From Swiss-Prot:
GO terms for biological process: NAD metabolic process; NADP biosynthetic process. Involved in the regulation of the intracellular balance of NAD and NADP, and is a key enzyme in the biosynthesis of NADP. Catalyzes specifically the phosphorylation on 2'-hydroxyl of the adenosine moiety of NAD to yield NADP. The active site is at D67. Keywords: ATP-binding, Cytoplasm, Kinase, NAD, NADP, Nucleotide-binding, Transferase. It is an enzyme of class 2 (transferase). Its cofactor is a divalent metal cation. It catalyses: NAD(+) + ATP = ADP + NADP(+) + H(+). It comes from Prochlorococcus marinus (strain SARG / CCMP1375 / SS120). PANTHER family: NAD KINASE (PTHR20275:SF0). InterPro entries: ATP-NAD_kinase_N, ATP-NAD_kinase_PpnK-typ_C, NAD/diacylglycerol_kinase_sf, NADK. This is NAD kinase 1. It comes from the Bacteria.
């Protein structure tokens, strides 16, 4: 990979991420590579701020933070399909990030320049809110948003119990009506996030599909389902005419929806390009390490066993 311009995006409000970003930038500049550094938060679209004055697409984006920082970068960069290399600095679980100690590896940049890495192309979701009550007004009010992990729907009423009633259509076919705390539509990448907490399945990122999971449904028959990635899903609030539903993209509030409106969710045209420093990465090894499955426990026991 020929490195001409690198963005270093770090987690907003994290002292350690900022310090690591400054050090990383100095190391990149010492190689004669142009670098731009900026912070990123849930409501801060750093990418647009950097692109507007420069109009130059980076060769590589370095993200320093947790999975939330990576998700934000992926949403804003997907249309450019720029490789994202992320490190867990000031973050939590870090399913999408590398260990920050790898930043100290003197061979890091030469490995990247010599293409000693793998690229994982991750499916994303695209959603839009539209009005459907007046056939002449369908699609007139539109609010587009993207997600790498998930798009989910929850009640935003403050004066009543936070339950909502949502209707699901798949490819124009009525499928179910969910009454409960909400509904999650997840990608394979997001299958180890909020969707997993609701009892949804874990999908290998090499599979392109959409998981539909109810959040605390008031029915034992409401089970998670997996549908083809090419499906067109529609979620709309039904029942109480005063009900308002908050739409969240990767854990960030993105839009409000009320009766008479619906959200259409489909597979996004572009993918998030995740750079993996292992040339033969193992998704299952990541699962055992991050979720502390038996495989990682056995490895630890073997390491501690007397020789």
């Amino acid at each position: 990979m020929k490195l001409e311009l690198i963005w270093v995006i770090y987690k907003s409000g994290s002292k350690s991420a900022k310090e690591e970003a400054l050090l990383c930038s100095r190391n990149i500049e010492s190689l004669g590579i142009k670098v731009i550094t900026a912070e990123s938060g849930p409501l801060l679209n750093t990418c647009n701020n950097i692109l507007n004055p420069n109009k130059q697409i980076p060769t590589l984006v370095i993200v320093l933070g947790g999975d939330g920082t990576v998700l934000g970068a992926a949403r804003h960069l997907a249309m450019y399909e720029v490789p994202i290399l992320s490190f867990n600095v000031g973050g939590n679980l870090g399913f999408l990030t590398h260990d920050r100690q790898l930043l100290k590896d003197e061979s890091l940049w030469s490995r990247i320049q010599e293409d000693q890495f793998a690229i994982e192309s991750r499916m994303m979701l695209k959603g839009r809110v539209e009005s459907y009550l007046d056939t002449n007004d369908v699609g007139k009010k539109e609010n587009f948003f993207w997600a790498l992990n998930d798009i989910y729907f929850r009640s935003c009423s403050e004066d009543i119990s936070p339950t909502c009633t949502l209707e699901l259509k798949i490819d124009d076919e009525d499928v179910d009506i969910y009454r409960g705390d909400g509904v999650i539509l997840s990608t394979p990448t997001g299958s180890t996030a909020y969707s997993m907490a609701t009892g949804g399945p874990i999908l290998h990122p090499g599979i392109e599909a959409i998981i539909v999971s109810a959040i605390c449904p008031m029915s034992l028959s409401s089970r998670p389902i997996v549908v083809p990635a090419g499906s067109r899903l529609i979620i709309k609030p039904v029942g109480n005419k005063n009900q308002r539903v908050n739409i969240w993209q990767d854990g960030v509030s993105s839009a409000l929806m009320q009766k008479g409106e619906q959200c259409v969710i489909e597979k996004a045209r572009n993918h998030a390009q995740m750079l993996i420093l292992e040339q033969s990465p193992s998704y299952f090894r990541t699962l055992t390490q991050k979720l502390h499955w038996a495989g990682s426990l056995v490895d630890n026991q073997n390491k501690m066993a007397p020789k």
